[in-house]
Amino acid sequence: MAAPPRRPRGPQPRDDAAIDVQVLDRQRALTISAAWLGRVVRRALARQGVTRAEIAILLVGDRRMARLHEQWLGIPGPTDVITFDLADGGPRGGLQGDIAVSAETARRVARELGWQPRHELAYYVVHGLLHLAGYDDHDPADRRAMRARERVLLRAAGLPPPPGSRR
């Protein structure tokens, strides 16, 4: 008689709990592991209490980011991150969105601040995730709350807080 199958230890994912992260790397400024960035996203979302999400991260250079910035926000020139909330409030729930990140900007700003470019890039991604979760940074009080939450999520992802007084 065969032994019954062993049950795995620890919490098991529910059928409705899934974090899908896709990383599309269209830049040459930094070498970024898609697996590492996916782990950053999953850990940050877990800390945020998100159990379902479909997130696409687009890594681009400054030229492509400038085109996206102009096309979607009407603002000329590159920026660090643009978030596209794609959630339609349908029955699946969870977060759905695309986050475009300029790796060139991350490299440049990291050099100015004296920390690792991949950490700056991860900071941009976490910032985008918080926008998808409903955070905003248009007024000082909201900005302070968002910055504090960014630090919490970066820590949850195993990353240091961003240096500098701007954060």
Protein language model features and the residues they cover:
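An acidic/histidine-cluster motif and surrounding catalytic segment
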Residues: 1-122, 130-167
